[in-house]
A protein has these predicted regions:
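C-terminal membrane-cytosol helix-exit motif in multi-pass small-molecule transporters
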Residues: 58-75, 93-102, 121-135, 374-379
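Helix-loop-helix hairpins in multi-pass membrane proteins, especially solute transporters
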Residues: 1-85, 112, 195, 237, ...
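Transmembrane core module of solute transporters
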Residues: 48, 85, 110-117, 123-124, ...
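Small-residue hotspots at the loop-to-helix junctions and early N-terminal turns
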Residues: 23, 183-187, 279
C-alpha cells in the first residue's frame, strides 16, 4: 500500500487530478477490505476452507504482472539504509499492547501478564522514538511529522480505520450468528458498504480540493460514528434493515476519511518524502485496524462472557467455559442440548452477544466522535501548505 500511494503522488504531483486519483485509490482500498469477507464467505459456503487462502495466489500473480507492465519506475535520489532495530522495536511494542488488549478479558485487566505487556509496550515505544532520533538512517524520520497535514491525516485515518475494521469484525459475527445467515449470505450483506465506498471515494476526491481535509474528514468520521451508534443500539430482535443503514454509513464515512487524509498527506510532502509519508499513512491504517479489532473485540468478549455467567442453564460448567469462547461455539453446544433447553440457551447466548455489541460499538462511536473534534481543531484549512499556514483564505 505505501508504494501504490507514493506512485500516485509521483504520477500526479499536484492538483485536482491527483486528488481524483487518490479518491479512486481510496475506493479500491476500502472496497477490497469489504470484498475480502464477501468472497471468503462465498468460498467457505462452497469449497474447502483452505480456498480462502489459495485465492490470494492468482490475485497476487495478476498484481505482479500488472505492476511490471503498468507502473512507472520511480525512486528517491538517495535511498536510505534499512533500519532493522527500529523495525523490531516498533513491531514488538505494538504487538505487546495488542496482546494485552486481547488477553485482558480472559486473564483479567489487572493480571501481572497483562500489566507487564502494557508496560513493555510503552517502554518499547519510548525506546523506538529515542532510536529514531539518533539513528543515522531511521525507519521513520520524526521530522516528517512537522508537516501538519501529514500528522493530522495519519491521526484521523487511524481513528477511521479503528471504526471501519472493528465494525466489520463485529458485524460479520452479528450477521452470521445472531441473524442466522450463512457465510456466503453474510458476505453479500456486507456488499452495501463496498458499494457506498465505491461511490464515496471518488466523490470525496472531488470535494477535498474545494472543502479541504478538515471538512471532508470530519463529515466522514461523523458518518462512521453514526454507523457505530446504530449497531450499538441494535436489539436481538432487529433484522437486517437496521444493519443496512449502518453498512451504508460505514462505507460512506470510510470513503470520505481515507480519501481526504491520504490526499492531504501526499499533497503536503516533497517528492523525496513521498515514500516514507505514504508508509506512515499505511501504517496508521493498519494500526487503527488492529486496534479496532483488539479493543472492540475485547469489549464485546468481556460483556458476552459476563452475560453467559448470568444465564441459568443445564449446561455443565466445563462446557459453559467453552461456550464463552465465542457465540459460534455456544450455538453449536446449544444444538446438543435437548429440546427447549437448547433453544433457551441459544437465545440467551445471542442476547449476551448483542449486549456485548453495546460497549464495543459505543467505543467505535466515541473514538470517531472524538475524531470529528480533532479534525475540526487540528486539520489544516483548505489551501494550507506543508507546515499548516494558508495560501488562501478558507471560505468554509
Amino acid at each position: 500500500m505505501p508504494a501504490t500511494l507514493a506512485v500516485i503522488g509521483n504520477v500526479f504531483p499536484r492538483g485536482a487530478e491527483r486528488t481524483k486519483a487518490i479518491g479512486i485509490w481510496s475506493a479500491a482500498v476500502g472496497v477490497g477490505t469489504v470484498i475480502g469477507p464477501m468472497v471468503g464467505g462465498w468460498l467457505l459456503s462452497h469449497y474447502w476452507w483452505g480456498s480462502v487462502f489459495l485465492i490470494n495466489l492468482p490475485i497476487g500473480i495478476a498484481g505482479l504482472i500488472a505492476a511490471a507492465l503498468l507502473v512507472p519506475d520511480s525512486r528517491a535520489p538517495e535511498s536510505g539504509r534499512l533500519d532493522p532495530a527500529g523495525a523490531l522495536l516498533s513491531v514488538v511494542a505494538v504487538a505487546s499492547v495488542l496482546w494485552a488488549v486481547i488477553e485482558g478479558p480472559d486473564r483479567g485487566w489487572t493480571s501481572s501478564a497483562v500489566l507487564a505487556a502494557f508496560a513493555a509496550g510503552a517502554l518499547l515505544a519510548v525506546a523506538f522514538l529515542a532510536w529514531q532520533r539518533r539513528a543515522a538512517s531511521p525507519m521513520l524520520p520524526l521530522r516528517i511529522f512537522r508537516h501538519r497535514a501529514l500528522a493530522a491525516g495519519d491521526l484521523l485515518v487511524l481513528l477511521g480505520a479503528f471504526a471501519l475494521i472493528g465494525t466489520l469484525f463485529v458485524a460479520v459475527q452479528h450477521f452470521q450468528f445472531v441473524l442466522g445467515y450463512s457465510p456466503g449470505q453474510t458476505g453479500l450483506r456486507l456488499g452495501p458498504a463496498a458499494l457506498a465506498l465505491l461511490v464515496a471515494g471518488p466523490l470525496a476526491g472531488v470535494l477535498a480540493p474545494r472543502l479541504g481535509m478538515r471538512i471532508v474528514a470530519a463529515v466522514g468520521l461523523a458518518m462512521l460514528s453514526a454507523s457505530s451508534a446504530v449497531l450499538a443500539t441494535t436489539e436481538a430482535t432487529d433484522g437486517y434493515s437496521r444493519a443496512l443503514v449502518a453498512m451504508l454509513l460505514l462505507g460512506w464515512g470510510a470513503g470520505f476519511v481515507i480519501t481526504a487524509t491520504s490526499d492531504a498527506i501526499v499533497g503536503s510532502l516533497p517528492e523525496t518524502d513521498l515514500g516514507v509519508g505514504s508508509a506512515t499513512n499505511s501504517a496508521a491504517i493498519q494500526l487503527g485496524a488492529a486496534s479496532g479489532v483488539a479493543v472492540m473485540g475485547s469489549l464485546l468478549s468481556d460483556r458476552y462472557r459476563g452475560g453467559l455467567d448470568d444465564v441459568p442453564s443445564p449446561v455443565p460448567e466445563s462446557l459453559l467455559d467453552s461456550a464463552k469462547e465465542s457465540l459460534g461455539t455456544a450455538l453449536a453446544l446449544a444444538e446438543r442440548l435437548p429440546g427447549e433447553a437448547g433453544t433457551a440457551f441459544a437465545e440467551a447466548a445471542r442476547q449476551a452477544f448483542v449486549d456485548g455489541m453495546g460497549p464495543a460499538m459505543s467505543a467505535g462511536a466515541g473514538v470517531t466522535a472524538a475524531g470529528v473534534l480533532l479534525a475540526l481543531l487540528l486539520a489544516p484549512l483548505r489551501g494550507a501548505d506543508t507546515t499548516g499556514t494558508t495560501h488562501q483564505k478558507d471560505s468554509s
